[in-house]
Protein backbone atom coordinates (compact mmCIF):
# COMPACT_ATOMS: atom_id res chain seq x y z
CA UNK A 1 0.00 0.00 0.00
CA UNK A 2 1.53 3.29 -1.08
CA UNK A 3 -0.23 6.51 -0.15
CA UNK A 4 1.74 8.33 -2.83
CA UNK A 5 0.13 6.44 -5.73
CA UNK A 6 -0.38 8.53 -8.82
CA UNK A 7 -3.48 10.70 -8.69
CA UNK A 8 -5.31 11.21 -11.93
CA UNK A 9 -7.61 13.90 -13.21
CA UNK A 10 -10.39 11.32 -12.95
CA UNK A 11 -9.57 10.80 -9.25
CA UNK A 12 -10.04 14.51 -8.65
CA UNK A 13 -13.28 14.55 -10.64
CA UNK A 14 -14.71 11.70 -8.58
CA UNK A 15 -13.53 13.28 -5.32
CA UNK A 16 -15.28 16.52 -6.30
CA UNK A 17 -18.44 14.50 -6.84
CA UNK A 18 -17.95 12.84 -3.43
CA UNK A 19 -17.69 16.36 -1.95
CA UNK A 20 -21.05 17.21 -3.56
CA UNK A 21 -22.52 14.11 -1.92
CA UNK A 22 -21.03 15.24 1.40
CA UNK A 23 -23.08 18.43 1.01
CA UNK A 24 -26.22 16.27 1.02
CA UNK A 25 -25.19 14.81 4.37
CA UNK A 26 -24.48 18.26 5.78
CA UNK A 27 -27.88 19.56 4.62
CA UNK A 28 -29.42 16.82 6.79
CA UNK A 29 -27.30 17.72 9.83
CA UNK A 30 -25.00 14.75 9.28
CA UNK A 31 -21.20 14.84 9.31
CA UNK A 32 -20.36 15.80 5.71
CA UNK A 33 -18.79 12.70 4.23
CA UNK A 34 -19.52 11.46 0.71
CA UNK A 35 -18.50 8.35 -1.22
CA UNK A 36 -18.63 7.25 -4.86
CA UNK A 37 -18.07 3.72 -6.17
CA UNK A 38 -16.86 3.39 -9.76
CA UNK A 39 -16.40 0.24 -11.86
CA UNK A 40 -13.38 -0.44 -14.05
CA UNK A 41 -15.14 1.21 -17.03
CA UNK A 42 -15.42 4.40 -14.91
CA UNK A 43 -19.19 4.11 -14.50
CA UNK A 44 -20.65 5.16 -11.17
CA UNK A 45 -22.27 2.07 -9.68
CA UNK A 46 -22.86 3.32 -6.14
CA UNK A 47 -22.87 6.47 -4.09
CA UNK A 48 -23.58 7.45 -0.54
CA UNK A 49 -23.36 10.08 2.14
CA UNK A 50 -23.55 9.86 5.90
CA UNK A 51 -27.05 9.07 7.17
CA UNK A 52 -26.38 7.67 10.67
CA UNK A 53 -28.43 10.32 12.48
CA UNK A 54 -31.32 10.44 10.00
CA UNK A 55 -31.62 6.66 9.84
CA UNK A 56 -30.76 6.04 13.52
CA UNK A 57 -28.20 3.57 12.18
CA UNK A 58 -24.59 3.61 13.39
CA UNK A 59 -23.54 1.72 10.25
CA UNK A 60 -25.01 4.25 7.79
CA UNK A 61 -21.64 5.72 6.84
CA UNK A 62 -21.12 7.07 3.32
CA UNK A 63 -18.79 4.19 2.40
CA UNK A 64 -21.19 1.48 3.58
CA UNK A 65 -24.10 3.05 1.70
CA UNK A 66 -22.03 3.38 -1.51
CA UNK A 67 -20.89 -0.26 -1.24
CA UNK A 68 -24.47 -1.45 -0.63
CA UNK A 69 -25.76 0.53 -3.60
CA UNK A 70 -22.97 -0.79 -5.81
CA UNK A 71 -23.60 -4.39 -4.79
CA UNK A 72 -27.33 -4.01 -5.50
CA UNK A 73 -26.64 -2.39 -8.87
CA UNK A 74 -24.35 -5.16 -10.09
CA UNK A 75 -26.21 -7.85 -8.10
CA UNK A 76 -23.03 -9.13 -6.51
CA UNK A 77 -21.54 -8.35 -3.11
CA UNK A 78 -18.06 -8.77 -4.59
CA UNK A 79 -17.21 -5.43 -6.13
CA UNK A 80 -14.16 -6.66 -8.01
CA UNK A 81 -12.17 -4.15 -10.09
CA UNK A 82 -14.00 -1.17 -8.60
CA UNK A 83 -12.68 1.98 -6.94
CA UNK A 84 -14.21 3.66 -3.91
CA UNK A 85 -13.72 7.41 -3.53
CA UNK A 86 -14.46 8.86 -0.10
CA UNK A 87 -13.88 12.33 1.31
CA UNK A 88 -12.62 11.08 4.70
CA UNK A 89 -10.33 8.21 5.61
CA UNK A 90 -12.53 5.20 6.47
CA UNK A 91 -13.01 3.97 10.03
CA UNK A 92 -12.42 0.35 11.07
CA UNK A 93 -16.03 -0.65 10.39
CA UNK A 94 -15.88 0.74 6.87
CA UNK A 95 -12.42 -0.76 6.32
CA UNK A 96 -13.90 -4.16 7.17
CA UNK A 97 -16.72 -3.68 4.67
CA UNK A 98 -14.22 -2.50 2.06
CA UNK A 99 -12.13 -5.62 2.65
CA UNK A 100 -15.13 -7.94 2.31
CA UNK A 101 -16.38 -6.18 -0.83
CA UNK A 102 -13.06 -6.96 -2.58
CA UNK A 103 -12.73 -3.57 -4.24
CA UNK A 104 -9.54 -3.05 -6.19
CA UNK A 105 -8.73 0.47 -5.05
CA UNK A 106 -9.57 2.99 -2.33
CA UNK A 107 -9.05 6.73 -2.81
CA UNK A 108 -9.68 9.10 0.09
CA UNK A 109 -9.31 12.81 0.70
CA UNK A 110 -8.78 13.93 4.31
CA UNK A 111 -6.98 11.84 6.90
CA UNK A 112 -8.86 11.06 10.12
CA UNK A 113 -6.44 11.19 13.03
CA UNK A 114 -9.10 10.15 15.56
CA UNK A 115 -10.59 7.05 13.96
CA UNK A 116 -8.94 6.56 10.57
CA UNK A 117 -8.17 2.91 9.85
CA UNK A 118 -6.00 3.32 6.75
CA UNK A 119 -2.86 4.68 8.34
CA UNK A 120 -3.72 7.73 10.44
CA UNK A 121 -4.81 5.92 13.59
CA UNK A 122 -4.90 2.25 12.65
CA UNK A 123 -3.25 0.28 9.83
CA UNK A 124 -6.07 -2.11 8.97
CA UNK A 125 -4.89 -3.19 5.52
CA UNK A 126 -1.24 -3.56 6.54
CA UNK A 127 -1.88 -6.78 8.47
CA UNK A 128 -0.36 -9.65 6.49
CA UNK A 129 -3.15 -11.95 7.72
CA UNK A 130 -5.79 -10.11 5.70
CA UNK A 131 -7.22 -12.21 2.89
CA UNK A 132 -7.44 -9.34 0.38
CA UNK A 133 -5.19 -6.47 -0.59
CA UNK A 134 -6.04 -3.30 -2.41
CA UNK A 135 -4.37 -0.21 -3.72
CA UNK A 136 -4.80 2.91 -1.57
CA UNK A 137 -4.37 6.50 -2.69
CA UNK A 138 -4.72 9.15 -0.01
CA UNK A 139 -4.77 12.93 0.03
CA UNK A 140 -6.80 13.56 -3.14
CA UNK A 141 -8.27 17.06 -2.66
CA UNK A 142 -7.31 16.66 1.00
CA UNK A 143 -7.45 20.37 1.73
CA UNK A 144 -10.99 20.76 0.37
CA UNK A 145 -12.18 17.62 2.15
CA UNK A 146 -10.58 18.66 5.43
CA UNK A 147 -11.91 22.21 5.18
CA UNK A 148 -15.46 20.96 4.67
CA UNK A 149 -15.24 18.97 7.90
CA UNK A 150 -13.51 21.77 9.85
CA UNK A 151 -16.14 24.30 8.80
CA UNK A 152 -18.94 21.90 9.73
CA UNK A 153 -17.58 21.23 13.22
CA UNK A 154 -16.76 24.90 13.84
CA UNK A 155 -20.34 25.83 12.93
CA UNK A 156 -21.67 23.04 15.13
CA UNK A 157 -19.60 24.28 18.13
CA UNK A 158 -20.87 27.84 17.60
CA UNK A 159 -24.46 26.60 17.49
CA UNK A 160 -23.92 24.68 20.75
CA UNK A 161 -22.51 27.84 22.42
CA UNK A 162 -25.53 29.86 21.33
CA UNK A 163 -27.88 27.14 22.52
CA UNK A 164 -26.11 26.94 25.89
CA UNK A 165 -26.20 30.73 26.33
CA UNK A 166 -29.89 30.81 25.43
CA UNK A 167 -30.71 28.06 27.93
CA UNK A 168 -28.71 29.89 30.60
CA UNK A 169 -30.50 33.17 29.94
CA UNK A 170 -33.87 31.41 30.13
CA UNK A 171 -32.98 29.72 33.42
CA UNK A 172 -31.82 33.06 34.90
CA UNK A 173 -35.28 34.59 34.43
UniProtKB/Swiss-Prot annotation:
Start and end residues of each CMP/dCMP-type deaminase domain: 9-121
Pfam families assigned: MafB19-deam (PF14437)
Record field: catalytic activity: adenosine(34) in tRNA + H2O + H(+) = inosine(34) in tRNA + NH4(+)
A single GO molecular function term of this UniProt record: tRNA-specific adenosine-34 deaminase activity
Class of the enzyme per the UniProt entry, highest EC level: hydrolase
Binding site for Zn(2+): 61, 91, 94
Function description: Catalyzes the deamination of adenosine to inosine at the wobble position 34 of tRNA(Arg2).
Protein's UniProt name: tRNA-specific adenosine deaminase
PROSITE patterns per record: CYT_DCMP_DEAMINASES_1, CYT_DCMP_DEAMINASES_2
Listed InterPro entries: APOBEC/CMP_deaminase_Zn-bd, CMP_dCMP_dom, Cytidine_deaminase-like, tRNA_aden_deaminase
Note describing how the cofactor binds: Binds 1 zinc ion per subunit.
EC identifiers of the protein: 3.5.4.33
A single BP term in Gene Ontology: tRNA wobble adenosine to inosine editing
UniProt similarity note: Belongs to the cytidine and deoxycytidylate deaminase family.
Cofactor: Zn(2+)
UniProt entry tagged with the keyword Ribosomal protein: no
Quaternary structure annotation from Swiss-Prot or TrEMBL: Homodimer.
Keywords noted in UniProt: Hydrolase, Metal-binding, tRNA processing, Zinc
Residues at the active site: 63 (proton donor)
Amino acid sequence: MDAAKVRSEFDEKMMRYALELADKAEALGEIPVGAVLVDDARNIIGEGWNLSIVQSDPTAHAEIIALRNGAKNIQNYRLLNSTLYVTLEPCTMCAGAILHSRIKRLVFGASDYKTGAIGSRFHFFDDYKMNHTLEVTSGVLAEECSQKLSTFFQKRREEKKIEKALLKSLSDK
